[in-house]
């Protein structure tokens, strides 16, 4: 299982998503605001805003919150900080490649906090380009294997233009080119196939398998990174054997 899918699974098992819903809302609102500021408030011509609103709806964010964030971005209402996007790259325990996407109003503060988290958990922050070449931007649509017809999903996804379907222990991950993401998701959703999550993200080309000690370190590091208010997304190219995953998520 890929690092991103693995981390999503353990968060659901631990109930971390519900306990940190307020923090998730804050991150999504920042993304909606910036997307609207950069590309306007019309979702038809702004795919980034469309993805941000999809993420908000997946978290059951009230429509008023979404609309207010869009209006802040377009300047219809005032308020809000001016954020800058930065991607930090580095290595985690066991040489795992890590990408950290942040949205910050103070780069000096943020880079110091990110560097501290890397160092404290057996990693080190690197320079621009040190690991980004190990990832590709892809659409990812994840389904619970117990809730879908796997054969039908594979057939429909490939016919709609999906590039690949990755089978995990409990999930199926439909991978698309970013330009085909909306089409494939809409086709599958139109056929009644409900996904667990859908987003455009950085997918690792290869993964590094971790032992129990390194896996525990890695998961703690990602948890601390995601808990940082400025961090929007974390991607890593690790793999954890299912038996170790079960032990760590117990």
Curated annotation (Swiss-Prot):
Its main location: cytoplasm. Gene3D superfamilies: 1.10.10.200, 3.30.70.980. GO terms for molecular function: DNA binding. Disulfide bonds: none annotated. GO terms for cellular component: cytosol. It comes from the Bacteria. Keywords: Cytoplasm, DNA-binding, Transcription, Transcription regulation. Pfam families: TACO1_YebC_N, Transcrip_reg. GO terms for biological process: regulation of DNA-templated transcription. It is found in: Cytoplasm. The keyword DNA-binding applies. InterPro entries: Integrase-like_N, TACO1_YebC-like_2nd/3rd_dom, TACO1_YebC_N, Transcrip_reg_TACO1-like, Transcrip_reg_TACO1-like_dom3, YebC-like. The keyword Cytoplasm applies. Belongs to the TACO1 family. HAMAP family: Transcrip_reg_TACO1 (MF_00693). This is Probable transcriptional regulatory protein SYNAS_07390.
